[in-house]
């Protein structure tokens, strides 16, 4: 995937997480409880486009943050 797109998606996730009032630790914990092997550090890397997202992580992030895929993948 294009690095600029990954950075934009990461920024979207960070913005949506902050809007929900969640910390990176909280999001990582919720993802772990949902079955994803992820740490706070990995969440931080996702948010700056330094780590790829796996499909199961995307699905859970959408559910945890209560947002749409359009909000996560918007590149405008």
Cite the ranges covered by each PLM segment.
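Conserved hydrophobic/aromatic packing and binding residues within compact polymer-binding modules
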Residues: 13, 27-28, 43-46, 72
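DNA major-groove recognition helix of helix-turn-helix/homeodomain DNA-binding modules
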Residues: 50, 54-71
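Recognition helix of helix-turn-helix/homeodomain-like DNA-binding domains
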Residues: 32-52
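Short basic helix-loop element that most often maps to the first helix and adjoining turn
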Residues: 11-32
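A detector for short, charged/polar N-terminal pre-domain segments
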Residues: 1-8, 74-75
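Helix-turn-helix DNA-binding elements, focusing on the entry/boundary residues of the two helices
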Residues: 13, 24, 40, 55-58
